[in-house]
Amino acid sequence: NNFSTNYNHSVDMASIAGSTESQRSIVNNWEFGDELKVNYRLNDNYEFTFHTGGKYYLINSERVGFEKIKASDYNIGLNAQIVLPWELQLTTDITMFARRGYQQTEMNTTDWIWNVQLARTFLKGHLTAKLQGFDLLQQLSNTRYVINSQGRTESWNNSIPRYVMLSLAWKFNINPKKK
């Protein structure tokens, strides 16, 4: 369990619609968060982890036109690591991410993210082959919405939200020569 709290008192200058002068903007930001993980290991071949977390935001200001924000972001999910026949290692994670309480409807979202990895080592552990699938349900968005200390900002991320990748990794040790 991991509880956190944060307070930010932000002072800035803001333009008000219909006015030619800037106005002092004072915004108080409270953030409360908690995370919880429960792990269960049946034996060396089966391990499961339940995880959940969330943050609650309380943002208010006396500034003209500012709408108080009472919003939350939370997630809940399950991880599994299973050893399959032929020494294959299966790792999977499915997590639901949700955002609620925002004035803009595009910020209130529910996204299910499912990732899978299948791995096997060869040559006494020196060579590892992995097949990874990220965001198999195709719900991850390129657009990320963030609320800063003065209001809402929208940032765009240039990324590949979903992919399947095959990789090979060679592990080698180089020992220093003795003098």
Question: Where are the language model's segments positioned?
Answer:
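Exposed, low-structure sequence patches enriched in small/polar residues
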Residues: N1-K179
